[in-house]
Design a protein with these regions (language model features):
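C-terminal motif of bacterial Sec signal peptides marking the signal peptidase cleavage site
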Residues: 24-28
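Extended amphipathic ligand-handling, pore-lining, and cofactor/metal-binding catalytic surfaces
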Residues: 53-58, 105-347, 352-414
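Intrinsically disordered, low-complexity serine/threonine-rich repeat tracts
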Residues: 34-53
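Beta-rich interaction/scaffold domains
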Residues: 49-114
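Bacterial Sec-dependent N-terminal signal peptides
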Residues: 1-16
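Bacterial signal peptide processing site
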Residues: 30-32
Length: 414
């Protein structure tokens, strides 16, 4: 982005003056006053042009600063006003100015990227909760279509299974909460807000159902927050994440992991147009599920999912992670594993509850470091296709969450 500094201003006005002087020399010093007027106009036009460019840059920088101010993990007393101000400033920009927005985290995509219809979602932040609440806790996503299909899909399934309970929502990522609020005007509770709402509404029995995959860092933080509110309720139960207990090493698998492995593989095979996984294998097609990865000890869950796929005889299904933790799940290692197994076609699909930023960019993006690009760049495969769909929209996965919720509800009565 070209900056119009004071030196630029001086250079331009000096150049304009020089042009005016040249014009005077060429027409003679005794030229009429119209020559002088023309020179002044040329100088003013040049100065005006720089001034306009500076104004564009200042307007774009203002929006970038406002976006960076709300791209934070902590909510404060100014957050609502900051979100509103950022959107108002963005809306006031011209299309050209919007393309100039660039900050530490800010870019034109923050407000400008179309991620679907936010009105299809339900923030589930209503009062009048009643005595019994199921609080569904998710990391969150700013991708509207995925939020409605994946997170709302899980919440709807739980609400259908428990019509006498009030299902409410909390996100743990304040950055995402702020993004959705600023761009779409949808206010989603963070954990503290959701728990305070439950207390204010006189909730007696609270069940917390995380949509997290595993007992990782996000789960631990959620537990700490819930523990700090336990004495505000008559009873509290926390349900299992999707993959259930972690286990001690990569060989440990359980009923949850088996159910997830079967559900996601069946969905991927069907979406790819095959009658069976074996038919896909005969076609030379491998399925690669890309998770997030973590440095938390729960990262062994990804290795366990690969063990589970192997135990089921799913020889053309591979597990990877964006972060490359565990090490064998790094993209380059998965590429080598698929290549060594002799498959010539690859289908990539996220091993994530939502198909958000990681699925759209890290997996299926056009950048050279996306998984799609890396598989293609290896030169080992005839085709690399992507299925951009989160786990949350899969009906069988939704029912696994319902089963975990049921176990937690039953524990309150036991």
């Amino acid at each position: 982005m070209r900056k119009a500094t004071n030196k630029n201003w001086q250079r331009v006005t000096a150049a304009a003056a020089a042009l005016a002087l040249c014009a005077g020399v060429l027409t003679g010093c005794g030229a009429s006053s119209s020559t002088a007027a023309g020179s002044t106009a040329a100088s003013s036009a040049a100065a005006s042009e720089v001034s306009s460019e500076e104004a564009d840059e200042m307007a774009a920088k203002n929006v970038a600063d406002l976006i960076d101010a709300i791209y934070v993990q902590e909510r404060n007393e100014n957050t609502d006003a900051q979100c509103e101000a950022a959107k108002a400033a963005w809306d006031a920009l011209t299309d050209a100015q919007k393309e100039m927005v660039e900050g530490e985290e800010a870019s034109p995509e923050y407000f400008g990227r179309d991620t679907g219809d936010a009105s299809k979602d339900d923030a589930r932040n209503q009062d009048n909760i009643g005595d019994n609440e199921i609080l569904v806790v998710s990391f969150g996503t700013s991708f509207n279509d995925s939020r409605a299909a994946d997170i709302k899909g899980i919440e709807d399934a739980i609400q259908a299974a428990y019509p006498d309970w009030s299902v409410r929502r909390a996100f743990t990522a304040q950055i995402i909460i702020n993004h959705v609020q600023a761009r779409d005007g949808e206010k989603i509770d963070n954990m503290e807000q959701a728990l305070e709402r439950a207390v204010a509404n006189g909730v007696k029995d609270l069940v917390v159902q995380p949509t997290h995959l595993m007992h990782g860092a996000e789960y631990d933080e959620m537990m700490e927050m819930v523990d700090s509110y336990r004495d505000q309720f008559e009873s509290v139960a926390i349900a299992e994440p999707l993959l259930g207990e972690v286990g001690s090493d990569a060989t440990v698998i359980n009923a949850d992991k088996e159910a997830v492995a079967k559900a996601i593989t069946a969905e991927a095979v069907k979406t790819a147009g095959f009658d069976s996984l074996d038919a896909a294998a005969e076609d030379g097609t491998a399925f690669v599920f890309m998770g997030h990865g973590t440095s938390h000890t729960a990262k062994v869950s990804y290795s366990q999912m690969q063990s589970q796929m192997n135990a089921l005889g799913y020889k053309n299904v591979f597990i990877g992670t964006v972060e490359g933790e565990p090490e064998e799940t790094a993209c380059e290692n998965v590429i080598e594993a698929v290549k060594a197994a002799g498959y010539t076609k690859v289908v990539l699909r996220p091993l994530m509850v939502v198909a958000g930023d990681h699925a759209n960019n890290d997996m299926a993006g056009d950048d050279e470091d996306s998984w799609k690009s890396q598989f293609e760049a290896s030169g080992e495969f005839d085709s690399v296709d992507c299925q951009i769909a989160g786990l949350g929209e899969v009906a069988d996965i939704q029912q696994l969450y319902v089963a975990h919720t049921k176990a937690a509800v039953d524990s309150l009565n036991g």
